[in-house]
């Protein structure tokens, strides 16, 4: 397992994109997409030799994420990429992690399955077994493109 990204919950995804780009020199690598299952807007940001950042903004009736943001938002989860999602879920459950969201299509990952687990100390874990990102506008290996779409 290796870290794919870390995720931050924000109130306004476009403002957050501007902030991460101007302060931390990240680049938007995917268009903002609407994830109807998780009821969030999603985008990924990248920076050479750094970890990928995922930003999520609550949409629709996502009351739990809206409540999270009222309390300040911020760090939401760490995502690990594994070789076999079902097998890794079973392994982590045997080690005491609690399954929060069973495998379901993740629109931010071109509908490949994702799952969420809860580790000790309230750490939310997302699991994926794909490299695909929906709405790719900037390859994570290519930097300096100005053709962003928000």
Indicate where each model-derived feature is located.
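Short, conserved turn/kink motifs that form compact alpha/beta structural patches or helix kinks used as
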Residues: 58-61
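Core segments of cupin and vicinal oxygen chelate
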Residues: 8-51, 88, 94-97, 102-110, ...
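Vicinal oxygen chelate
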Residues: 3-12, 43-46, 66-91, 115
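Structural preference for solvent-exposed beta-strand-turn elements
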Residues: 26, 105-112, 121, 128-131, ...
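Short, conserved beta-strand edge motifs with alternating hydrophobic and charged residues
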Residues: 54-56, 79
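N-terminal beta-strand motif that seeds the catalytic metal site of vicinal oxygen chelate
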Residues: 1-17, 73-80, 133-150
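Short, charged/polar, Gly/Pro-enriched secondary-structure boundary elements
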Residues: 50-53, 122-125
